[in-house]
From Swiss-Prot:
InterPro entries: ELM2_dom (IPR000949), Homeodomain-like_sf (IPR009057), REST_helical (IPR049048), SANT/Myb (IPR001005), SANT_dom (IPR017884), Trans_reg/Corepressor (IPR051066)
Source species: Mus musculus
Placement of covalent cross-link Glycyl lysine isopeptide (Lys-Gly) (interchain with G-Cter in SUMO2): 88
Lineage of the organism: Eukaryota, Metazoa, Chordata, Craniata, Vertebrata
Protein name: REST corepressor 2
The keyword Nucleus is annotated on this UniProt entry: yes
Gene Ontology MF, one: enzyme binding
Compositional bias segments (type: Pro residues): 432-459, 504-523
Limits of the ELM2 domain: 44-129
Coiled coil: 283-314
Gene that this polypeptide is encoded by: Rcor2
Entry comment describing in which tissues the protein is expressed: Predominantly, but not exclusively, expressed in neural tissue. Strongly expressed in neural domains of the developing brain of the developing mouse CNS.
Length: 523
């Protein structure tokens, strides 16, 4: 066969080559023509046989095992679709980035997972924590330390940063490398000062060595080695770095590396980590789980803050009570008149505030009421009291709880109050007024309502309500406490007697709104 016949020639060719190479060394003669012929025959040979054929595997049909043995291919992250517009896509990416911390690739992957349904993707963003692609301060410090130890060996750097992939490490390396050349003026000054200080220390060390060598020339000591002499014309080059490193050999504290700010090393932790090889991995896993839980808390806090921010943007309009659609009515009821007098006593001529207190009256209607009922309710005196309070006059003392509950008031205070009331009435009220029967004692369990509040309505209807008994005057009514204001709706006898035209007995004062009775015929 040709293959069998050609193989010895190939071997002889190889042997001839080796002989030709070893011939000059061994002194054996050789011929250049023979070697060229052998090389030509070796190159032109036909390579036939199993040694020169490729191994073709048998054909296998389609089966799941065929694809299981292959390497894991890349996963499709994003595929554009015409159903999602560019503006809508940009809005979705911005919302995913601001509210949930997703980057563009993660947000598009979520959108592709939900088949380009933006609403479902937005609802599902909060259910997942995005892979942390940001570099924290600890990650940056660890990267710098790992780069100082291992250089550009990113596989070893990844062992110190297991949550970072190698492409992310390479990307951060080049961005970090650009910032290394940027030094501020303060950094330059610090370097200069540090270089000067190191130079002074090295000079001091050299002087100390020279003094020792001059004072104690121990030439016979076998332990002491002579210092290597340096040539005078040494060029500054790679050896300069070695000189800088060697000058710190007598200062071990300067060569000691300290952990960055915020990180510390404890002997107990180092002992525990170096005790067993698995304990270090377990410790790192615990720290990773703790870091992941903290990041989840941060993400939940961000979501809570965003929801609260959305609630604040809505305003407080939904929380306001519904305003009742009050219809303005020009008719004044008894309760509204009472409330208006109390409001005048409280606000004076601030008719806008009085209209807001009443509720169903306009500013013009309140002004008309003040002009029309000025004499009827003696509003001038009410205004004088309000002006006296505004000028700084001492206000009436508020009755204590004991007086409200019906505690006995000292008799001297009541007698003085009654004397003042009688003298004030006697100077103004005519003598023709018949004496009124003593009023009934006030109930001890009841107390007057606070100002600007409507009095409680009786259980009976308004039409069937009976008027209260007639009273002689507000000055003769006993009070629970001194200087307590009188009821505002009782028509004063002073105003009635002053404005009455005909002499004779005058009718007693009546309540506002009560039906007027004709005077009894005089005998």
């Amino acid at each position: 066969m040709p293959s069998v016949m050609e193989k010895p020639s190939a071997g002889s060719g190889i042997l001839s080559r080796s002989r030709a190479k070893t011939a000059p060394n061994g002194g054996q003669p050789h011929s250049e023509d023979d070697s060229s012929e052998e090389e030509h025959s070796h190159d032109s040979m036909i390579r036939v046989g199993t040694n020169y054929q490729a191994v073709i595997p048998e054909c296998k049909p389609e089966s799941p095992a065929r694809y299981s043995n292959k390497e894991l291919k890349g996963m499709l992250v994003w595929s554009p679709n015409h159903c999602v517009s560019d503006a809508k896509l940009d809005k979705y990416i911005a919302m995913a980035k601001e509210k949930h911390g997703y980057n563009i690739e993660q947000a598009l992957g979520m959108l592709l997972w939900h088949k380009h349904d933006v609403e479902k993707s937005l609802a599902d963003l909060a259910n997942f924590t995005p892979f942390p692609d940001e570099w924290t301060v600890e990650d940056k410090v660890l990267f710098e330390q790992a780069f100082g130890f291992h250089g550009k060996c990113f596989q070893r750097i990844q062992q110190m940063l297991p949550d970072k992939v190698i492409p992310s490490l390479v990307k951060y390396y080049y961005s970090w490398k650009k910032t290394r050349s940027r030094t501020s003026v303060m950094d330059r000054q610090a370097r200069r000062l540090g270089g000067r200080k190191d130079k002074e220390d090295s000079d001091e060390l050299e002087e100390g060595r020279g003094a020792v060598s001059e004072g104690e020339p121990d030439t016979g000591d076998p332990k002491r080695e002579p210092l290597p002499s340096r040539p005078l014309n040494a060029r500054p080059g790679p050896g300069k770095k070695e000189v800088q490193i060697s000058q710190y050999r007598h200062h071990p504290l300067r060569t000691r590396r300290r952990p960055p700010k915020g990180m510390y090393l404890s002997p107990e932790g180092l002992t525990a980590v170096s005790g067993s090889p698995d304990l270090a991995n377990l410790t790192l896993r615990g720290l990773d789980s703790q870091l992941i839980s903290l990041k989840r808390q941060v993400q939940s806090m961000k979501q809570t803050n965003s929801s609260l921010r959305q609630a604040l943007e809505g305003g407080i309009d939904p929380l306001r009570p519904p305003e009742a659609n009050t219809k303005f009515n020009s008719r004044w009821t008894t309760d509204e008149q009472l409330l208006a007098v109390q409001a005048i006593r409280r606000y004076g001529k601030d008719f806008g505030a009085i209209a807001e207190v009443i509720g169903n009256k306009t500013l013009t209607q309140v002004k008309t009421f003040f002009v029309s009922y000025r004499r009827r309710f003696n509003l001038e005196e009410v205004l004088q009291e309000w002006e006296a309070e505004q000028d700084g006059a001492p206000a009436a003392p508020v009755p204590t709880e004991e007086a409200r509950r019906g505690a006995p008031v000292p008799a001297t205070a009541l007698e003085e109050d009654d004397e003042v009331q009688i003298t004030s009435v006697s100077t103004s009220v005519p003598r023709s007024v018949p004496p009124a029967p003593p009023p009934p004692p006030p109930p001890t369990s009841l107390s007057q309502p606070p100002p600007l509040l409507r009095p409680p309505l009786p259980t009976a209807p308004t039409l069937l309500r009976q008027p209260p008994p007639l009273q002689q005057g507000r000055f003769l009514q006993p009070r629970l406490a001194p200087n307590q204001p009188p009821p505002p709706l009782i028509r004063p006898a002073l105003a009635a007697s002053r404005h009455s035209a005909r002499p004779g007995p005058q009718p007693p004062p009546t309540l506002v709104g009560a039906p007027l009775e004709p005077p009894a015929p005089s005998l």
